[in-house]
């Protein structure tokens, strides 16, 4: 009988600082029996214990852990503190509990397989297929396949984890010497120059700079830990949230979100000697200018994506990128890196992160509860006035974007802009997903009424119906029409298609992928650089 995995136990290490983000409304993970699990929180290390012999209708339980405590959160909503020690991260498996029960089975031995680690530079993404069973005798794969680099805090030593497949297949000891990687001894700033042309409608600083770079080193935002506690829940996403209903794991702590679409297949190292590149300019304007193709196109770079994919876009007129975070993913210096204040969780550290005339995109889809970080418009405006606007006025931020709304967020944006008339907003950030080109036209034309440049930082051709997604020809047709429209629209300053990856999840569909399965440009990718 075919073995499936419906029981998944997650042990989460406490995470430090602001984490990067990948879009979070496409988190389907399926096997032939249906949805196994969906989760939204980016975490530094994920451990999965798969229990064979169950099907996807069985209960499953998630666990989160720091170094001193473990919380069990089962499918019926119960939460129970589990015993542990200061040197262990406990991973337990669970059987399907009796009705209205969170009974948990604690086998004498079990396999804890860390699938990957991540850091503020490179976040992992998940596979759309079942997690393979691993045993102490045959671990799922070598560490180099599943691991990206993990930044050590200043108190941790600089050794790599895991040391061997034996460690991968055994329960994990959370001593600081095991889960570390290359950490830069110092963070030097190398500068390069770029040019800018002020948009007529933008606020112009007398001397402003824009942050960009090809960072390959990690810089921690703070030393404080965020305790994460996730619970498996069933989330019904409304039509306003793109009409998808999926089970979801919601986080009770401040965190970011992640696309869970493909297994990280190669390690991305953080070199100890690498430096953050921060491109600056002393031009009289804060508005960026690009070259080639339209001069507007960029990359919505999903953290954890193979860096080699970016080579397909070098010297092809794609000259900027962002990654939903505040630290570069390490792409070529030919791409300007644009920062994102993804949510409100790390605002207190904004003054140390946004410096030197940085370009900053605002909160990510705060109008959507499904985005994992909903903020009402009035509160968002107050955050801008308290944390971001002073940085814009001082020149630390040289070009400040509005929150990036979804294409059902125009009312939210209207309320925000009314409450934030003194916020020094330089450009409107937005997302759009759909299949009707005329709807995209109407959306952009409506946003143009604010009289500010527009950045369309996510868009793709999808109806969110994974049983009847648009065909490749339909995607190509919409992209071709959209590129011509956006290139010719006087208010559109920048845009980025979702996404330069091979796997985009069931919601968006892989026909939108700019990268083919072989790692080169897909047919859609070829159109994007033409």
Swiss-Prot record:
Write the record's keywords in alphabetical order, separated by commas.
Cell wall, Endoplasmic reticulum, Glycoprotein, Golgi apparatus, Secreted, Signal
Instruction: Spell out the InterPro entries in the cross-references.
Output: ASL1, Asl1_glyco_hydro_catalytic, Glycoside_hydrolase_SF
In this record, what's one Pfam family?
A: Glyco_hydro_cc
> Which organism is the protein's source?
Schizosaccharomyces pombe (strain 972 / ATCC 24843)
Q: Which domain of life is it from?
A: Eukaryota
The signal peptide here is 1-18
UniProt-annotated glycosylation sites, renumbered to this chain: 55, 120, 128
| Gene Ontology cellular-component terms listed | endoplasmic reticulum; external side of cell wall; extracellular region; fungal-type cell wall; Golgi apparatus
Q: By what name is this protein known?
A: Alkali-sensitive linkage protein 1
Source gene? asl1
List the lineage, top down: Eukaryota, Fungi, Dikarya, Ascomycota, Taphrinomycotina
GO:BP terms for this protein?
A: fungal-type cell wall polysaccharide metabolic process
- What is the first-listed, main subcellular location in coarse terms? endoplasmic reticulum
Residues of the region (Disordered) are 69-90
Cross-referenced PANTHER family, in alphabetical order?
ALKALI-SENSITIVE LINKAGE PROTEIN 1 (PTHR34154:SF3)
GO MF terms held by the record: hydrolase activity, hydrolyzing O-glycosyl compounds
What subcellular compartments does it reside in? Answer: Endoplasmic reticulum; Golgi apparatus; Secreted, Cell wall
């Amino acid at each position: 009988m075919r073995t499936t995995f419906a029981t998944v136990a997650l042990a989460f290490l406490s995470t430090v600082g602001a984490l990067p983000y990948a879009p979070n409304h496409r988190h389907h993970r399926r096997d032939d029996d249906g949805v196994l699990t969906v989760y939204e929180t980016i975490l530094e290390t994920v451990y999965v214990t798969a229990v064979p012999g169950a099907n996807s209708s069985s209960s499953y339980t998630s666990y989160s852990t720091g170094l001193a405590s473990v919380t069990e959160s089962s499918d019926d909503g119960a939460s129970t503190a589990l015993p542990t020690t200061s040197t262990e991260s406990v991973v337990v498996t669970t059987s399907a509990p009796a009705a209205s029960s969170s009974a948990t089975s604690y086998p004498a031995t079990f396999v804890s397989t860390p699938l990957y680690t991540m850091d503020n530079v490179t976040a992992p993404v998940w596979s759309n297929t079942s997690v393979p069973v691993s045993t102490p005798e045959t671990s799922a794969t070598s560490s180099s396949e599943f691991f990206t680099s993990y930044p050590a805090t200043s108190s941790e030593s600089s050794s790599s984890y895991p040391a061997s497949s034996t460690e991968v297949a055994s329960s994990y000891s959370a001593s600081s010497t095991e889960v570390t990687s290359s950490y830069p001894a110092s963070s030097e700033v190398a500068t390069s120059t770029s040019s800018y042309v002020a948009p007529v409608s933008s606020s112009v600083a007398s001397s402003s700079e824009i942050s960009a770079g090809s960072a390959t080193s990690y810089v921690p935002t703070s030393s404080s830990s965020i305790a994460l506690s996730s619970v498996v829940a069933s989330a019904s996403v409304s039509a306003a949230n793109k009409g998808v209903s999926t089970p979801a794991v919601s986080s009770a702590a401040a965190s970011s979100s992640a696309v869970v679409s493909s297994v990280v297949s190669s390690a991305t190292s953080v070199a100890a000697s690498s430096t953050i590149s921060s491109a600056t300019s002393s031009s009289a304007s804060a508005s960026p200018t690009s070259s080639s193709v339209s001069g507007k196109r960029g990359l919505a770079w999903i953290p954890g994506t193979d860096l080699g994919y970016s080579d397909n876009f070098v010297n092809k007129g794609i000259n900027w990128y962002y990654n939903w975070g505040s630290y570069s993913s390490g792409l070529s210096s030919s791409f300007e890196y644009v920062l994102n204040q993804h949510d409100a969780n790390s605002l207190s550290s904004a003054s140390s992160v946004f410096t030197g005339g940085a370009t900053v995109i605002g909160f990510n889809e705060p109008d959507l509860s499904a985005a994992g970080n909903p903020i009402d418009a009035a509160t968002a405006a107050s955050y801008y006035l308290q944390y971001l606007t002073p940085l814009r006025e001082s020149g630390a931020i040289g070009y400040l974007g509005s929150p990036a709304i979804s294409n059902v967020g125009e009312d939210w944006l209207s309320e925000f802009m009314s409450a934030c008339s003194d916020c020094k907003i330089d450009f409107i950030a937005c997302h759009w997903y759909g299949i009707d080109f005329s709807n995209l036209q109407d959306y952009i034309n409506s946003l143009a009424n604010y009289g500010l440049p527009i950045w369309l930082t996510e868009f793709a051709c999808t109806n969110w119906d994974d049983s009847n997604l648009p065909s490749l020809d339909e995607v190509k047709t919409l992209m071709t029409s959209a590129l011509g429209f956006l290139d010719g629209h006087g208010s559109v300053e920048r845009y980025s298609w979702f996404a330069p990856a091979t796997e985009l999840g069931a919601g968006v569909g892989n026909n939108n992928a700019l990268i083919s399965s072989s790692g080169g440009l897909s047919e859609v990718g070829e159109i994007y650089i033409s």
